[in-house]
């Protein structure tokens, strides 16, 4: 009888995951798996690295962050545009990542770009109605939040989440701004991030528990269907996130629209969040208006054969 050699199972390291990575001069970086899911959003400086997201994405299940188009009509649908459940194409250049495709009669392109020198990140979503009739839709942005050292977060994500303080501020133009501060000291610093929608957010959530309640439990995607508003209530719980709902619009055939979601990160924010922190967003509007398109080669992401396999019963 032939004896099989011993098999050694090991946890894959970053070098084994074939990540695509973009970064800027401020130390901000975004890493993406071959399936186009966001693996990590990090800030590294002076030998210290802070994860802005809470959990690392997986090659099979992907990650928690994403952008969705929600389309109305007789059968409302929610379409994931980023990550393992998206069905479009993906590409990258030095300063940005791009997801693009067409689904349910809606053509889209998502561009994730970094400010060249500052801790600013932008998600630009462009859509075009390819249907023969006018169509109502909105967009939902979801980012899981950790704001800590990777070891601190992965030791107990729920514990780390409970130390994140959420503050809801109102900007004169951009409306709801979600501010999150890690109250558990990270080597003497208190990481902080703000999220908003340049065109104005009309709904929000601060924990995934709010996105997975009884009304959404049987939905295909956690963003819910068009017409289901985010709760717009602050919840401090075990799976912190910044979730924002855009204004709804109605697009005529061939008409296009654009939304830009953004984040502003500070590696150390000694004081609690307040309305005064809106001053940190002064350059956002200008940066959004100066967005420059770039030609990027796109290809089909690498999808695991296990990803779409039916669940065992």
Q: What is each residue range found by the language model?
A:
Residues 104-106, 152-161, 235-245:
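Short beta-strand and strand-turn-strand segments in soluble, beta-rich domains
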Residues 95-117:
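Low-complexity, acidic Ser/Thr/Pro/Gly-rich terminal tails and inter-domain linkers that flank the onset
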């Amino acid at each position: 009888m032939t004896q099989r050699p011993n098999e050694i199972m090991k946890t894959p390291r970053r070098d084994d995951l074939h990540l695509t990575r973009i970064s800027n001069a401020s130390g901000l970086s975004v890493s993406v798996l071959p399936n186009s899911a966001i693996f990590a959003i990090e800030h590294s400086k002076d030998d210290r690295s802070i994860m802005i997201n809470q959990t690392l994405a997986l090659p099979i299940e992907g990650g928690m962050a994403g952008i969705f188009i929600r389309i109305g009509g007789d059968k409302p649908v929610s379409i994931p545009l980023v990550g393992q459940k998206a069905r479009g194409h993906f590409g990258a250049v030095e300063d940005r990542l791009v997801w693009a495709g067409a689904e349910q009669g809606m053509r889209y392109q998502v561009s994730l770009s970094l400010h060249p020198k500052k801790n600013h990140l932008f998600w630009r979503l462009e859509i075009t109605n390819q249907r023969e009739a006018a169509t109502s839709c909105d967009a939902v942005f979801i980012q899981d939040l950790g704001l800590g050292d990777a070891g601190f977060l992965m030791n107990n994500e729920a514990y780390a989440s409970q130390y994140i303080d959420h503050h809801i501020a109102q900007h004169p133009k951009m409306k709801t701004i979600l501010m999150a501060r890690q109250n558990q000291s990270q080597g003497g610093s208190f990481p902080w991030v703000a999220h908003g929608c340049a065109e104005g957010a009309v709904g929000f959530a601060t924990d995934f528990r709010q996105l997975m309640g009884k009304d959404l439990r049987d939905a295909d995607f956690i963003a819910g269907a068009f017409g289901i508003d985010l709760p717009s209530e602050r919840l401090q719980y075990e799976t912190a996130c910044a979730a924002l709902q855009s204004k709804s619009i109605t697009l005529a055939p061939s008409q296009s629209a654009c939304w830009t979601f953004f984040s502003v990160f500070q590696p150390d924010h000694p004081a609690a969040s307040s309305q005064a922190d809106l001053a940190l967003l002064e350059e956002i509007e200008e940066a959004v208006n100066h967005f420059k398109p770039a030609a990027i080669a796109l290809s089909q992401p690498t999808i695991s054969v296990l990803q779409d396999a039916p669940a065992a019963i």
